[in-house]
């Protein structure tokens, strides 16, 4: 069943580990599992996938805690002046993230790292087992929801949103993007999500610590998650020197596109998708996020740069130049060449054209 205690017991059995460290995450897990159980109308396959997903999150927490206890130096790793892309969904954040991440001096979390931030021992020259597992999950999603890929590219080895790291604290809106969980959503809206951002930072430190750095400067993190818009005050508390790139696009265009993506995501877990209810819920959330972002911007104007989706589409490298000037980074020939190669490999609509209209969602 989707019961918090049974999931915790399963994770302990699977890993052979007992210690979660700080267990304040339990409240969020309990509220979430109750909501999924009673409100989400999960079909049997959806319930099975959700159980595996939540157990996987708990397994990572157990393994991470073991490393934090053995290696306190992990939490001393510096995460300096990260670039943070925070704009509403469908505003060019993925394209911009992949472009910036292609600079060899930048460090972005890959999809397979988001699924499991902890590197396991494997023979030199062999494929990381995390990459294999994530490719398998990608294949399953392609089978269950082929249209999803035209909306949002999924690639095991490509940069991924760290919203998935916030999810390890059970204080993120990932659940709302996968299922109808109104009581969890209402509870989450009232929470201080600082513990999720602090845990996210510790996982970034863990990934950085695991990766043997070449001599010289450590890479600079480039992060990207639309949900940061609602919590920029907390993000700046945890990463005080963050440089925030806020992306913009006509909301009438993004609302339908994003509603379509969420509705397809829900369809993996349930046969009962109310597209209009999905759209109304996320429209309310997005309005709240933008209003919260504007309040934070008024207090920290120097931390932000604005980037238009239309300018990114027209001349992405010109926008990168402006971002780098803002962040005090030199745009080197090597970085420029890497970005041009990334652009050529990922043309718009590579995975198909995504068709939708506002009317489909009662907007």
Each language-model region and where it sits:
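PAPS-dependent sulfotransferases, especially Golgi type II membrane carbohydrate sulfotransferases
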Residues: 1-66, 74, 180-197, 204, ...
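Phosphate-binding P-loop
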Residues: 73-80
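Glycine-rich phosphate-binding P-loop
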Residues: 84-104
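Short His-Asn-centered micro-motif
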Residues: 86-88, 222-226, 309
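Post-Walker A helix-loop "phosphate-sensing" segment adjacent to the P-loop in P-loop NTPases
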Residues: 102-112
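PAPS-dependent sulfation machinery
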Residues: 113-221
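Flexible, glycine/threonine-enriched loop-and-boundary segments that flank and lead into catalytic domains
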Residues: 218-241
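Conserved phosphate-donor/acceptor-positioning beta-strand/loop module used by diverse small-molecule
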Residues: 235-260, 323
């Amino acid at each position: 069943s989707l019961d918090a205690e049974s999931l915790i017991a399963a994770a302990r059995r699977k890993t052979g580990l007992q210690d979660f460290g700080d267990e304040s995450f339990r409240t969020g897990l309990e509220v979430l599992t109750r909501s999924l159980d009673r409100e989400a109308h999960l079909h049997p396959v959806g319930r099975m996938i959700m159980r595996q997903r939540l157990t996987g999150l708990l397994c990572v927490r157990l393994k991470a805690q073991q490393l934090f206890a053995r290696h306190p130096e992990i939490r001393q790793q510096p995460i300096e002046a990260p670039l943070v892309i925070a704009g509403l969904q469908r505003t060019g954040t993925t394209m911009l993230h992949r472009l910036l991440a292609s600079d060899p001096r930048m460090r972005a979390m890959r999809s397979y790292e988001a699924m499991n931030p902890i590197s396991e021992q494997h023979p030199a020259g062999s494929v990381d087992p995390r990459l294999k597992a994530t490719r398998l999950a990608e294949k399953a999603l392609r089978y269950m929801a082929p249209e999803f890929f035209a909306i949002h590219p999924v690639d095991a080895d490509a940069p991924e949103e760290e919203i998935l790291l916030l999810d390890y604290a059970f204080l993120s809106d990932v659940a709302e993007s996968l299922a109808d969980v109104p009581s969890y959503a209402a509870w989450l809206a009232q929470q201080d999500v600082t513990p999720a951002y602090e845990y996210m930072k510790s996982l970034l430190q863990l990934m950085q610590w695991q990766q043997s750095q070449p001599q010289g400067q450590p890479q600079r993190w480039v992060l990207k998650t639309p949900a940061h818009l609602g919590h920029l005050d907390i993000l700046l508390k945890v990463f005080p020197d963050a440089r925030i790139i806020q992306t913009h696009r006509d909301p009438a265009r993004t609302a339908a596109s994003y509603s379509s993506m969420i509705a397809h995501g829900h369809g993996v877990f349930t046969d009962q998708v109310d597209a209009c209810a999905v759209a109304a819920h996320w429209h309310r959330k997005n309005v709240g996020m933008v209003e919260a972002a504007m309040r934070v911007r008024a207090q920290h104007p120097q931390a932000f740069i604005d980037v238009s989706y239309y300018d990114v589409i027209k001349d992405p490298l010109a926008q990168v130049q402006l971002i780098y000037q803002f962040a005090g980074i030199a745009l080197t020939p090597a970085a420029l060449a890497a970005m041009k190669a990334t652009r050529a490999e990922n043309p718009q609509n590579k995975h198909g054209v995504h068709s939708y209209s506002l009317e489909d969602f009662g907007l």
